[in-house]
């Protein structure tokens, strides 16, 4: 059985409709812990997942908005198993920042 992970996300964008739709998709697909408010094109929210960062689900959500000014950062953690991940969506693609960082140091 996979453990429950906490995800803290920051979603920003200049197109308010796209921003609202991405946030709606996240809240529809995952259990959100906090009240969701958009302020000046930015929203911070917290949600849970069964297991690590839900890359496939997030890619499916963001694939709908190619070429849009959309920036998403997600920190995923589950402390009992020492899991920490940092993913960024920028310029139409997702990157795993910690994986990149530690591959460069090896």
Regions found by a protein language model. Give the residues of each.
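Short, extreme N-terminal segment that most often corresponds to the first beta-strand
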Residues: 1-26
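Charged interaction segments
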Residues: 21-106
